[in-house]
Every structure is written in structure tokens, then in C-alpha cells.
């Protein structure tokens, strides 16, 4: 473990030395165009909402026709799934939301990331098998089998983004990941089922430099599907899920529903800034 932590610290130091605009992570990533933001804003808001952190912006997407349900399909205000006991949480910190749209057959499963200081490195950069990744895939598969009529998409931020990408590789479902962990597991047989997989990250976000040379991440993600944003966070951590989501929402002026919804999200912490 000490050697692994040394590697991680070295990588983060390397990231800290990257101060020029060209050294922002993924060398060939595209800057996200303003008129593309509306494609990803909803997923980013769901990824952010999974934290249920009262100190951060909550996006009331219920007003857009979405309902968070538990594993039995009942409306819930908490995460759809969390470990049932403290013993279970020791082996897996998996938490996720199931969002079902009331007027369509669309479902979005949003995996919670982690921003606890103690387990942040372990969750995002640890090397080796991971119980949360296996459990995430199992739960998505079970939902699809139980609801074959629904169109399922996965999303997540940080560790949650890694869980979403891994589930997509195994189960052939579209995935949208925000500031994701570089850890992506596709199994011994290198499962790479065809699906749309997109990564959106804020420039100089702490994991971007690591993802840019993490072997498995580079193998499964083409840089043509990786997009960088340059929102102004005014000194707040560039890894924040709610700031990235708000920036994308503020830029969604080509979608009337999202444009109107953005006016309800206050106070304004992030402006658009994309071109």
C-alpha cells in the first residue's frame, strides 16, 4: 500500500507542476462548445445530486419530470441504494440514485462519487479488484432485467464516473462521466460493448493528469469523446460536481426547458463562459 500511495502522490505532484494552458490533462481533448452543453447538463446535475450534500447546490430536476425511486420503485428522497449496515459500508461504499422519467421510458442510474478526504485516494486511484465496481455492474444488470422496457443510461462524478464507464463497457449502455476516476474495469476478457461513452471534465481538475496516462483509461476512452470545460470557479476546487453541473446548465440556452429551469437554480455560482 505504501508503494501505491507513493505512486499516487508522485502523480499528483506532477499534476501540480503543470501550470501552462497546454498542460491541463488530456492532450487531445476537445473544448466543449456552448451549444453542446445541453446534451450533458441533465446527467451532470444527476451526478451532483447523488452526493445529497446540503452545503452544495441541489438541482430540483423533479420539476423536469424525473422521480428518484428506490430498488422497489417507490419514490424516495434519499439515495436509491446505500449499504444497509456499517459492516457492508466497510467493504463497499457504493451508493447510487435511480431516476425514472414520468412521461417516457428513460431511466438514469447515477453513481455517487466520493469526496471524503480519508478514502478519496483509495476510491479513485487504488490498484486491484474493487467490490463497488462489481456491485455497480450487478445492480445495473438486475435493473435492466427487471425493467426490459426501459432505456437505461448511467452517469456519475469522480468515482461514480468510473463506475458508470465500467458498467457501460460490460452492459452496452450509454455512459456520461464527469471528472471521472481513471479506474475502469472491463474484466479479464476486455469487455468493450458498443455504446456511447463521453467524459466531461473541468480544466486542471485533479484527476485529469492521471487519466491522461492511466493505461486502461486510455485504452477504453478515445480522446475524441473527452471534452474539457473552462468555467470560472472563483477559487473553489475544480473537482466540484455541482459547479461543473451548474456551468453546463447555464450554457444550455439552446434548450428552452433547461434555459427556464436554470433561472430557478439560485444563487448563481457559475456562469457559462463557453463559446
Where are the regions a protein language model picked out?
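A conserved cap/lid and substrate-binding interface adjacent to the catalytic center
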Residues: 19-29, 38, 42, 51-154, ...
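Bacterial N-terminal signal peptides that target proteins for export
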Residues: 1-6
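Gly/Ala-rich beta-loop-alpha elbow adjacent to hydrolase catalytic centers
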Residues: 155-160, 164
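Serine hydrolase/lipase
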Residues: 19-27, 103-106, 173-275
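C-terminal motif of bacterial Sec signal peptides marking the signal peptidase cleavage site
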Residues: 13-16
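Hydrophobic membrane-insertion alpha-helices, especially the h-region
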Residues: 9-11
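Short glycine-enriched nucleophile-adjacent loop
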Residues: 165-169
Amino acid at each position: 500500500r505504501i508503494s501505491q500511495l507513493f505512486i499516487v502522490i508522485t502523480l499528483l505532484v506532477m499534476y501540480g507542476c503543470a501550470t501552462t494552458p497546454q498542460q491541463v490533462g488530456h492532450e487531445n481533448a476537445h473544448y466543449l462548445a456552448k451549444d453542446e452543453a445541453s446534451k450533458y447538463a441533465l446527467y451532470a446535475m444527476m451526478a451532483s445530486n447523488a452526493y445529497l450534500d446540503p452545503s452544495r447546490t441541489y438541482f430540483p430536476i423533479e420539476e423536469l419530470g424525473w422521480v428518484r425511486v428506490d430498488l422497489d420503485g417507490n419514490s424516495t428522497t434519499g439515495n436509491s441504494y446505500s449499504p444497509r449496515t456499517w459492516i457492508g459500508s466497510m467493504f463497499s461504499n457504493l451508493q447510487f440514485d435511480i431516476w425514472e422519467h414520468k412521461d417516457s421510458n428513460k431511466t438514469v442510474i447515477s453513481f455517487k462519487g466520493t469526496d471524503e478526504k480519508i478514502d478519496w485516494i483509495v476510491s479513485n486511484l487504488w490498484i486491484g479488484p474493487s467490490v463497488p465496481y462489481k456491485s455497480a455492474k450487478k445492480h445495473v444488470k438486475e435493473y435492466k432485467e427487471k425493467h426490459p422496457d426501459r432505456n437505461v443510461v448511467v452517469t456519475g462524478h469522480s468515482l461514480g464516473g468510473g463506475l458508470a464507464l465500467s458498467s457501460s463497457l460490460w452492459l452496452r449502455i450509454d455512459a456520461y462521466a464527469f471528472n471521472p476516476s481513471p479506474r475502469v474495469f472491463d474484466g479479464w476478457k476486455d469487455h468493450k460493448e458498443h455504446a456511447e461513452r463521453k467524459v466531461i471534465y473541468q480544466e486542471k481538475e485533479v484527476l485529469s493528469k492521471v487519466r491522461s496516462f492511466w493505461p486502461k483509461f486510455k485504452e477504453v476512452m478515445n480522446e475524441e469523446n473527452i471534452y474539457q470545460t473552462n468555467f470560472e470557479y472563483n477559487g473553489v476546487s475544480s473537482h466540484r460536481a455541482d459547479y461543473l453541473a451548474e456551468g453546463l446548465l447555464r450554457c444550455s440556452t439552446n434548450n428552452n426547458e433547461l434555459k427556464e429551469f436554470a433561472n430557478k437554480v439560485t444563487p448563481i455560482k457559475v456562469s457559462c463562459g463557453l463559446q
